[in-house]
């Protein structure tokens, strides 16, 4: 293609590596149970939704429930009837997380929930005059008595879920580093595969929080 300095193969390898990283990010934010795997079943990481149960808010009146059992990530949470995100719901989970010893520093949420958060009271800088001809409608940092968090809108985050995160208490563990491998040729056609395996490592579930069962429209 015009403007490419490398081969078409190199371009597609790079593109697929980027897509693979997005797939991993999406899996992290999913409500999926982990699978240990065996000779016939692929291993699967447990998403954040299947880990969090100490500091959560969900709709108990609408059949919502935390994951069960004592093994983190082993069972998915039960989705409940959805309700709108409110400041009270958010602040309640922030308080629970602080009481449990957490020091959250970031909030991951969808674009829809970010717009809901912009209406939180106390956001005095929500609308302020920027350069001539512009209006700033943004809230990057939210301060509470239980800590200061940075808002991180995330395309891969399930819109019905909001996660309150302490980054030091999460990690992406690499089981197999990303590797570009050549496969057998078919005539003049060259084939390659990009293989990697990562999993979500939760170092302290009690340092994290989540607001679940949120409306998405």
Question: Language model features by range: what are they?
Answer:
Residues 1-217:
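Core alpha/beta structural scaffold of self-assembling particle/tube/pore-forming proteins
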């Amino acid at each position: 293609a015009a403007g490419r300095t490398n081969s078409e193969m190199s371009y597609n390898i790079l593109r697929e590596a980027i897509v693979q990283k997005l797939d991993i990010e999406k899996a992290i934010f999913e409500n999926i149970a982990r699978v240990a795997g065996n000779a016939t079943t692929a291993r699967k990481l447990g998403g954040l939704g299947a880990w969090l149960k100490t500091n959560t808010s969900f709709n108990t009146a609408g059949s919502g429930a935390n994951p069960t059992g004592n093994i983190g990530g082993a069972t998915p949470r039960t989705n409940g009837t959805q309700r709108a995100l409110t400041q009270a719901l958010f602040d309640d989970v922030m308080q629970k997380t602080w009481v449990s010893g957490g020091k959250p520093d970031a909030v991951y949420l969808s674009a829809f929930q970010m717009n809901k958060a912009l209406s939180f009271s106390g956001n005095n800088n929500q609308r302020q005059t920027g350069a001539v001809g512009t209006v700033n409608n943004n809230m990057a940092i939210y301060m509470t008595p239980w800590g200061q968090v940075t808002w991180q809108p995330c395309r891969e985050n399930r819109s019905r879920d909001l996660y309150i995160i302490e980054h030091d208490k999460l990690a992406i563990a690499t089981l197999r580093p990303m590797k570009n491998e050549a496969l057998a040729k078919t005539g003049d056609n060259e084939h390659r595969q990009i293989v990697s395996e990562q999993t979500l490592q939760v170092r302290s579930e009690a340092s994290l929080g989540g607001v679940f069962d949120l409306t998405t429209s």
